[in-house]
Regions:
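Noncatalytic, helix-rich "gating/capping" subdomain that lines the substrate-entry/channel surface
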Residues: 170-174
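Signature of dsDNA virion morphogenesis modules
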Residues: 1-169, 179-180
Length: 180
C-alpha cells in the first residue's frame, strides 16, 4: 500500500544519548529504531529514500515547530539495520537552543521525534499501526517528553532553563502543566 505523500507523519522515540561534546554543542543520539511506537507504527531505517537531500538542509527543530527557527543542524546521519543515529550540532547563537542542548547534556531530555512523508506503508491489522518501508525525512525534532516527566519540573526549579520562550512554552505545555 502506498500512503499519500502530502500527509506528513511524526514518530516519537524515547531516544538514547550516545555521546555529548559540550565544547562543540554536539549530541550523538539514536533518533529512531525499528521498535513499534505507542500507536504500533514501525519505521524501517533502510527505507529512508532522501538522506542526501535532507543533509543539504539538515534542520533540527524544537517539537516539530516549523514556524520557529531551527535549534540546530544534523551533521551526520547513520542508518543501521535497527536504528538511526544522528549527530546534532545545536546553535550557539540561540539562547533557546543552548538551553535545549543543556537539557540533553544533563540527561534531562532524551526524546527525539522524526517528521517524515510516508511513501510505502503496510498496515498491521492485528497489531495496529503501520510498517513504513519507504519514507522521506523532512526533519527531526528535540521533544520535551522525557521518560521521567518530573525532570522538566526539576530543570525549571533548579534554574537550568534560562531562555524565556522555552520556560513559557514548558509552562504552557499540557504535559508539563501536569507536573509543574
Amino acid at each position: 500500500m502506498t500512503a499519500p505523500r502530502a500527509d506528513p507523519k511524526i514518530l516519537a522515540f524515547p531516544g538514547q544519548t550516545l555521546k555529548v561534546d559540550e565544547s562543540k554543542m554536539l549530541v550523538r543520539s539514536i533518533i529512531s529504531t525499528t521498535a513499534p511506537d505507542r500507536a504500533g507504527d514501525v519505521i524501517v531505517p533502510a527505507g529512508l529514500r532522501n538522506a542526501d537531500e535532507y543533509l543539504r538542509n539538515p534542520v533540527v527543530l524544537w517539537a516539530h515547530q516549523r514556524s520557529l527557527p531551527p535549534i540546530g543542524i544534523c551533521e551526520r546521519l547513520t542508518l543501521e539495520a535497527d536504528r538511526i543515529i544522528a549527530e546534532t550540532k545545536f546553535s550557539a547563537s540561540s539562547p533557546f537552543a543552548q538551553d535545549v542542548f543543556k537539557l540533553y547534556a544533563e540527561g534531562v531530555l532524551r526524546g527525539w521525534s522524526i517528521g517524515f512523508l510516508p511513501v510505502q506503508a503496510t498496515p498491521q491489522a492485528a497489531k495496529g499501526g503501520s510498517i513504513y518501508r519507504e519514507w522521506d525525512l523532512l526533519e527531526y525534532s528535540a521533544v520535551p517528553i522525557p521518560e521521567n516527566p518530573q525532570a522538566l519540573t526539576l530543570a525549571i526549579r533548579k534554574g537550568m532553563i534560562h531562555d524565556a520562550d522555552l520556560r513559557h512554552w514548558l509552562m504552557c505545555d499540557v504535559m508539563a502543566a501536569l507536573v509543574l
